[in-house]
């Protein structure tokens, strides 16, 4: 990421860290070094607050001022008092947050190991989902069979990913 930022000083580089809490590495440490870096995070994934539309951006004072100058023109998801209170509470309860993220990561790794026993393969995941493929059974076939059993995964009929399923990690009970 630093290589991209350093070689593109004439543009704003936005790093979306929606899934960083699940094991990724944040670019926050680069903020003091690069004026053209904007790091954005959401409460939708690791804080399980997708419907609240809460997130934040970190960057130079100039970038943040520019965002503030246009936020009411382009932001159709302005925050109401309930969202602000719930977002604040989620930040203040760091113990619960860390326990929740750890549980999701542990469930993801357990599920991945179980699915590997069935022949599935996965690229490395640092998110709350797995991208799964089976060498002998087409993803579309698995998708349709799962849907018939009320198991909902995502299938993308697109080149390069049409033999993969996106499996969101739920509770241990749901994943069993």
Show which residues each predicted segment covers:
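Active-site pre-lysine segment of PLP-dependent enzymes
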Residues: 1-13, 17-49, 63
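Hydrophobic residues in well-ordered beta-strands that form the structural core
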Residues: 15, 41, 124, 153-155
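PLP-dependent aminotransferase class I/II
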Residues: 36-116, 120-123
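Short acidic/glycine-enriched loop/turn segments that link adjacent beta-strands
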Residues: 51, 126, 160-163
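Short beta-strand-to-loop capping motifs
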Residues: 59, 132-136, 169-171
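Conserved PLP-binding catalytic core of the aspartate aminotransferase-like
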Residues: 105, 113-149, 165
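PLP-dependent enzyme catalytic core of the Aspartate aminotransferase-like
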Residues: 145-149, 154, 158-176
């Amino acid at each position: 990421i630093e290589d991209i930022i350093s070689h593109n000083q004439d543009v704003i580089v936005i790093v979306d860290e929606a899934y960083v809490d699940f094991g990724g590495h944040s670019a926050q440490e680069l903020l003091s070094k690069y004026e053209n870096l904007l790091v954005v995070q959401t409460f939708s994934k690791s804080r399980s607050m997708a419907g609240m539309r809460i997130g934040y951006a970190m960057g130079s004072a100039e970038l943040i001022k520019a965002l503030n100058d246009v936020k009411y023109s382009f932001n159709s998801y302005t925050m109401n008092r309930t969202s602000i209170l719930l977002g604040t509470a989620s930040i203040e309860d760091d113990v619960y947050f860390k326990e929740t993220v750890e549980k999701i990561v542990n469930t993801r790794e357990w599920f991945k190991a179980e699915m590997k026993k069935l022949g599935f393969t996965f690229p490395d995941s640092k998110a709350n989902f797995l991208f799964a493929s089976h060498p002998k059974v087409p993803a579309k076939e698995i998708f349709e069979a799962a849907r018939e059993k009320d198991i909902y995964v995502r299938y993308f009929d697109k080149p390069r990913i049409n033999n993969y399923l996106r499996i969101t990690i739920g509770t241990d009970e749901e994943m069993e």
